[in-house]
Amino acid sequence: MSKKIYCIASFEAKEGLNEELFKALQSLEPQTIREDGCIQYIVTKHITHPNATGKSFPIVFNEIWESKEAFELHCNKPYIKEFFHKHCVLEDGFVKDFNVCVYSDE
């Protein structure tokens, strides 16, 4: 087994702001993918499929990090903290609700 960390960060935009939120999240990709320990960092949109009928927020980040330490460093980067404050905390942000979960394969 590895010490990789798998993060699923899902977001629900406020009414009418889905595309704006998606673009704001996409803007985080180029800088994050260059971080030490980042293996994968991809923002995705929910699609419908007859073999996948579960419920989810419409926008999801799929992240893989080399270690817990690499993930923690990422979470403490100023641009990540700024995104969460601007869009998840402040009233005029794009995010209605969000959920961040981390997993290990150990």
Predicted segments with their positions:
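Active-site-flanking beta-strand signature of metal-NTP-handling nucleotidyl enzymes
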Residues: 5-11
